[in-house]
Amino acid sequence: MSIKNKMKDFFGLEEDPNSTYEEEEYAVANAAAPSTTETSVVRQDDRPKSANNLVALNTKKKDRSKVVLAEPRVFAEAQDISDHLKENRAVIVNLQRMSKEQSRQVVNFLSGVVYALEGSMTSIGHNTILCTPNNVELTGSISNLISEDELHSKGW
């Protein structure tokens, strides 16, 4: 068998001798039947076959990424933030409404959560941090153009 014939067999381009026999048998059966059945067979064959072969490409609903904004006032709210991280959501945490000691505890707690989830934690402003799980890639940086002393003098 030549390569050309093998390729035809592989792609199904070569006619099978058995298929011509079936077609001849079908044609003989249709010739013997009354003309009303012949027209019904023709009508069935005239239907568009693409309707049966439709496949929806968007069958799976895409999971959208979410970013949660959190502004905890007490340390106990840090557990809610960690739950969001465990559910693969990025969290922006504003610590301005907490005392310095409590905000330090929240940062320590969240750094442990982020480490356990193999995520990352980045400061994005004065008393504001971004915690991301491992499925979120963070690119770029925010430079601190204003020193913290200037922020405190302006009341920020």
From Swiss-Prot:
Chain intervals for the UniProt region annotation (Disordered): 30-49
Subcellular location: Cytoplasm
Keyword GTP-binding attached: no
Top-level taxon in the UniProt lineage: Bacteria
Keywords, comma-separated and alphabetical: Cell cycle, Cell division, Cytoplasm, Septation
GO biological process: division septum assembly; FtsZ-dependent cytokinesis
InterPro entries membership: Cell_div_SepF (IPR023052), Cell_div_SepF/SepF-rel (IPR007561), SepF-like_sf (IPR038594)
GO cellular component term of the entry, any: cytoplasm
Function of the molecule: Cell division protein that is part of the divisome complex and is recruited early to the Z-ring. Probably stimulates Z-ring formation, perhaps through the cross-linking of FtsZ protofilaments. Its function overlaps with FtsA.
Family under the similarity heading: Belongs to the SepF family.
Subunit-level organization: Homodimer. Interacts with FtsZ.
Designated name of the protein: Cell division protein SepF
Species of origin: Exiguobacterium sp. (strain ATCC BAA-1283 / AT1b)
